[in-house]
């Protein structure tokens, strides 16, 4: 399978150094148009994709690789801006990756560990039926959930179909040896 963790569907609010030039644009409709063209080209070449970082990492200023970012906006703001590319692209997205960002007005848990975000918003309201990959569980933005096995448990319980542990072989080994694996409906 030819696959990439792209496109980045985050909006460029001009305040997130970690997203920065990874974002296509500030306008969600422009992001949707450009990302659709990118994904269509990838599909023609036989490559699967992953839209990230649901519901949006562009507004939060902190870098989730080193700390847990917080986005204090209400759900209505996020829906009318950051979720637009996900809503417009729908089944074009082979998979989606949630953000290691907390949205306290919506859920106390970071999006990748939140049933509110993954089950109610992404799968429920937006009707998304593809795969959900966690973001890298070895990132500092995920560490507030607990140790590595607790993170993998929480991501899977929230609705992730697959978990990622990058550049940390010992943590990957710990999860492989201790995780209670379940089959999700995405594989049926």
How would you label these PLM feature ranges?
Residues 2, 12, 41, 45:
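Mid-sequence acidic-hydrophobic segments that form the walls
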């Amino acid at each position: 399978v030819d696959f990439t963790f792209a496109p980045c569907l985050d909006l460029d609010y001009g305040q997130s150094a970690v997203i920065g030039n990874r974002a296509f644009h500030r306008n969600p409709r422009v992001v949707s148009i450009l990302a659709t063209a990118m994904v269509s080209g990838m599909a023609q070449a036989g490559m699967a994709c992953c839209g990230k970082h649901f519901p949006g990492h562009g507004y939060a200023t902190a870098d989730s690789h080193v700390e847990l970012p917080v986005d204090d906006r209400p759900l209505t703001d996020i829906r009318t801006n950051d979720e637009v590319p996900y809503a417009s692209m729908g089944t074009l997205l082979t998979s989606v990756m949630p953000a290691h960002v907390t949205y306290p007005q919506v859920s106390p848990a970071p999006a990748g560990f939140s049933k509110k975000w993954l089950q109610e918003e992404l799968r429920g309201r937006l009707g998304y039926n593809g795969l959900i990959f966690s973001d890298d569980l070895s990132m500092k933005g995920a560490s507030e959930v607990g140790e590595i096995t607790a993170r993998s448990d929480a991501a899977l319980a929230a609705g992730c179909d697959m978990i990622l542990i990058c550049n940390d072989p010992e943590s990957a080994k710990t999860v492989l040896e201790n995780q209670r694996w379940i089959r999700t409906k995405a594989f049926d």
